[in-house]
């Protein structure tokens, strides 16, 4: 099995690509979903965030106010680093757990959907391939304004908080251009999926795992024989 890092930019259409991959039966680990789970009410990350930022980031229900927290993240780099230092270790642990589960299920490759894959840098070394969902800057801006009901200035600020898509292009092994319609995007995803499925890059890990498993079985059998002698 090998890992494929999937990334994009805000409103570049990564969710569309993920939905197509899931339709194809691909294993996708969603870092954003995990990030929401690790800060649920009562979790260690939740307690640390409240301790650092105070009750002002909470809803009446006691849960984190994601809009307020998002405004902090996008407007203050130092506070963004604080939140990342709280949540990222727990996110990585859960991603590892899910990756191992897909390995035991026999998947040839697993997609790690990580919005800030190239910004964080630390995760790219684990990826056999990286995939970027791209769209032109004007399309990205218009999509974000429409999707989140933001002004042009607000949308521009949120886009500026991430590495520009054009800067990510040379960092990616594969690019899905999502500037057009869904059918065009789907064709690109199908082609890439076929290439990844036909790759033999998964074999070394499988062979190593099989060798280790065989060795453990032989060792266990030897111990059992001694016990019964």
Curated annotation (Swiss-Prot):
<dbReference type="GO" id="GO:0015937">
    <property type="term" value="P:coenzyme A biosynthetic process"/>
</dbReference>
<keyword id="KW-0547">Nucleotide-binding</keyword>
<comment type="similarity">
    <text>Belongs to the CoaE family.</text>
</comment>
<dbReference type="Pfam" id="PF01121">
    <property type="entry name" value="CoaE"/>
</dbReference>
<keyword id="KW-0067">ATP-binding</keyword>
<feature type="binding site">
    <location>
        <begin position="8"/>
        <end position="15"/>
    </location>
    <ligand>
        <name>ATP</name>
    </ligand>
</feature>
<protein>
    <recommendedName>
        <fullName>Dephospho-CoA kinase domain-containing protein</fullName>
    </recommendedName>
</protein>
<dbReference type="GO" id="GO:0004140">
    <property type="term" value="F:dephospho-CoA kinase activity"/>
</dbReference>
<dbReference type="InterPro" id="IPR027417">
    <property type="entry name" value="P-loop_NTPase"/>
</dbReference>
<dbReference type="InterPro" id="IPR001977">
    <property type="entry name" value="Depp_CoAkinase"/>
</dbReference>
<feature type="domain" description="DPCK">
    <location>
        <begin position="3"/>
        <end position="207"/>
    </location>
</feature>
<dbReference type="GO" id="GO:0005524">
    <property type="term" value="F:ATP binding"/>
</dbReference>
